[in-house]
Amino acid sequence: MGFNKDIFTVDLMLGIPEKEDRSDWYTFMEPLLRDEESKSMFKMPAQYMFKDIPETGSHDDFVQYALGEMDKHHINQAMVGFHEQSEVKILAGKNYPDRFFFDLPVNPNTPNEAANIKRIYEEFGIKAVSAFPSGMYPQVAINDEKWHPIYEMCVELDLPFFCCVGVPGPRIPMAPQKVELIDEVCWYFPELKFVMRHGAEPWTALACKLMLKYPNLYYSTSAFSPKHYPEDIVNFANTRGKDKIMYAGYFPMGLSLDKIFAEMQNVPFKDDVWPMFLGENAKKLLKL
């Protein structure tokens, strides 16, 4: 069978723009940026890694624009970062609940963040929680005790925790996202469903070893074009980990869906891996 457009597909990282200029998506990172190129020349802080950042243009209805891109590439559902002040995202979830669902970006430096997760969950029905440990100021390592109330709330509400791991693309310190730190978190919170984001490089072999060790540890392919999927991850999916690896894109932050799906068909997944990777694993984990 291999890759084909008829496989149910869930994109675990897709953005809905609200205007053509998306530079305000990255203001949270400004206190960490020190080199002039990152501060003043890039459209986004990891632009040196992404040659063709999508230009979305201006649209009267960005939700319809996002749906059009999804339909073009046969994406059935997409997970979008939720912001309570965003009318666009609230309307997307309200008007198209069969197409969009949400993760809530969190920061343990924010007072009462765990209580806020519960409030947003009860009011808006988020499906997951997400974080960028190296991108927050001050940075907070994955295994720092500051995360414990958030991890506990994720367990209480049965919400998966999606976390950037490995060397971050922006020129900021990597220490908070070392893959080895996940070991302590999964040990201390065995019921926490932890999903790695953004590569886990250069520690992909360790990421696979930890996924074998912990039943609730997963990996999503966000921010990587398919031709650059780590070999360790592809091999793991084809052997002992087909229920652990899930598709996530990076549109429009750094990759176009045209590029992703043009390259996707060349990923050497086994036939029985494709449905799991593209949608079935996400449906099961997130109860879609």
Describe the role of every protein-language-model region.
Residues 9, 78, 100-102, 161, ...:
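Hydrophobic/aromatic residues located in beta-strands of well-ordered beta-sheets
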Residues 59-68, 110-121, 204:
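Short, acidic/polar
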Residues 1-12, 19-68, 72, 77, ...:
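Mid-to-C-terminal alpha-helical segments outside catalytic/metal-binding sites
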Residues 68-76, 96, 156-157, 188-192:
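A structural motif corresponding to the C-terminal end of an alpha-helix
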Residues 17-19, 85-88, 109-112, 136-137, ...:
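Active-site environment of divalent metal-dependent phosphoester hydrolases
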